Amino acid sequence: MFTQLDDTGYKAAIEACEAGVALFYKKLCPHCKNMEKVLDKFSGLGTGVSLFSLDIEENPAAAQEFSAERAPTILVVKNGKVTGQKAGLMNPKEMLAFYKSC
Protein backbone atom coordinates (compact mmCIF):
# COMPACT_ATOMS: atom_id res chain seq x y z
CA MET A 1 0.00 0.00 0.00
CA PHE A 2 1.37 3.38 -1.04
CA THR A 3 1.41 6.53 1.05
CA GLN A 4 0.73 9.48 -1.24
CA LEU A 5 3.19 12.33 -0.65
CA ASP A 6 3.18 15.91 -1.91
CA ASP A 7 5.54 18.88 -2.19
CA THR A 8 4.78 19.96 1.39
CA GLY A 9 5.43 16.66 3.20
CA TYR A 10 7.86 14.55 1.20
CA LYS A 11 11.04 15.73 2.98
CA ALA A 12 9.72 14.88 6.45
CA ALA A 13 8.45 11.48 5.26
CA ILE A 14 11.80 10.58 3.71
CA GLU A 15 13.80 11.78 6.72
CA ALA A 16 11.61 9.70 9.06
CA CYS A 17 11.82 6.56 6.92
CA GLU A 18 14.19 3.74 7.86
CA ALA A 19 13.50 1.65 4.76
CA GLY A 20 11.40 2.81 1.84
CA VAL A 21 10.85 3.21 -1.86
CA ALA A 22 9.35 6.31 -3.47
CA LEU A 23 7.70 6.10 -6.89
CA PHE A 24 7.51 9.25 -8.99
CA TYR A 25 4.72 8.71 -11.52
CA LYS A 26 2.34 10.34 -13.97
CA LYS A 27 -1.37 9.47 -13.86
CA LEU A 28 -1.62 8.51 -17.53
CA CYS A 29 1.66 6.58 -17.69
CA PRO A 30 1.09 2.84 -18.34
CA HIS A 31 4.62 1.93 -17.19
CA CYS A 32 3.92 3.70 -13.89
CA LYS A 33 0.84 1.56 -13.30
CA ASN A 34 2.92 -1.55 -13.99
CA MET A 35 5.63 -0.32 -11.61
CA GLU A 36 3.01 0.11 -8.87
CA LYS A 37 2.16 -3.59 -9.26
CA VAL A 38 5.86 -4.51 -9.18
CA LEU A 39 6.36 -2.53 -5.97
CA ASP A 40 3.29 -4.15 -4.39
CA LYS A 41 4.85 -7.55 -5.12
CA PHE A 42 8.23 -6.30 -3.88
CA SER A 43 6.73 -5.16 -0.57
CA GLY A 44 4.94 -8.51 -0.28
CA LEU A 45 8.29 -10.30 -0.22
CA GLY A 46 8.60 -9.44 3.47
CA THR A 47 11.08 -6.65 2.89
CA GLY A 48 9.51 -4.38 5.53
CA VAL A 49 9.83 -1.46 3.12
CA SER A 50 7.45 1.53 3.18
CA LEU A 51 6.05 2.58 -0.19
CA PHE A 52 5.53 6.21 -1.15
CA SER A 53 4.22 7.78 -4.34
CA LEU A 54 4.43 11.27 -5.79
CA ASP A 55 2.75 12.56 -8.93
CA ILE A 56 5.46 14.37 -10.93
CA GLU A 57 3.00 16.79 -12.51
CA GLU A 58 1.33 17.77 -9.22
CA ASN A 59 4.56 17.93 -7.19
CA PRO A 60 7.14 19.74 -9.31
CA ALA A 61 9.35 20.78 -6.37
CA ALA A 62 9.94 17.19 -5.25
CA ALA A 63 10.42 16.03 -8.83
CA GLN A 64 12.93 18.80 -9.47
CA GLU A 65 14.87 18.15 -6.24
CA PHE A 66 15.43 14.53 -7.25
CA SER A 67 15.71 15.20 -11.01
CA ALA A 68 12.74 12.90 -11.58
CA GLU A 69 12.11 13.92 -15.18
CA ARG A 70 11.02 10.49 -16.44
CA ALA A 71 8.17 8.40 -15.16
CA PRO A 72 8.42 6.05 -13.45
CA THR A 73 11.40 7.06 -11.33
CA ILE A 74 12.24 5.05 -8.21
CA LEU A 75 14.05 6.37 -5.14
CA VAL A 76 15.44 4.00 -2.52
CA VAL A 77 15.38 5.44 1.01
CA LYS A 78 17.44 4.01 3.86
CA ASN A 79 17.88 5.62 7.27
CA GLY A 80 16.25 8.86 6.16
CA LYS A 81 18.44 9.37 3.10
CA VAL A 82 17.98 8.65 -0.59
CA THR A 83 20.58 5.98 -1.37
CA GLY A 84 19.63 5.14 -4.95
CA GLN A 85 17.61 6.34 -7.91
CA LYS A 86 16.58 4.68 -11.16
CA ALA A 87 14.17 5.57 -13.95
CA GLY A 88 12.19 3.02 -15.91
CA LEU A 89 10.26 -0.18 -15.42
CA MET A 90 11.70 -3.13 -13.47
CA ASN A 91 10.36 -6.57 -12.61
CA PRO A 92 10.16 -7.66 -8.92
CA LYS A 93 13.48 -9.54 -9.11
CA GLU A 94 15.25 -6.52 -10.63
CA MET A 95 13.64 -4.24 -8.05
CA LEU A 96 14.86 -6.42 -5.18
CA ALA A 97 18.39 -6.51 -6.61
CA PHE A 98 18.35 -2.72 -7.10
CA TYR A 99 17.09 -2.14 -3.55
CA LYS A 100 19.76 -4.40 -2.06
CA SER A 101 22.50 -2.70 -4.09
CA CYS A 102 21.68 0.75 -2.70
Regions found by a protein language model. Give the residues of each.
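Non-catalytic, surface beta->alpha helical segment in thiol-disulfide oxidoreductase systems
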Residues: L75-C102
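N-terminal "domain-start" segment that seeds a small globular fold
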Residues: M1-A12
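Structural micro-motif
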Residues: F66-L75
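CheY-like receiver
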Residues: A12-A13, A62-F66, F98
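Typically the conserved alpha-helix immediately C-terminal to a functionally engaged Cys/Sec
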Residues: K33-G46
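Short active-site neighborhood of thiol/selenol oxidoreductases, capturing the structured segment around
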Residues: E15-K27
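The canonical Cys-X-X-Cys-His
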Residues: C29-C32, I74
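Thiol-based oxidoreductase modules, predominantly thioredoxin-like and allied folds used
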Residues: T3-L5, F24, S43, T47-A61
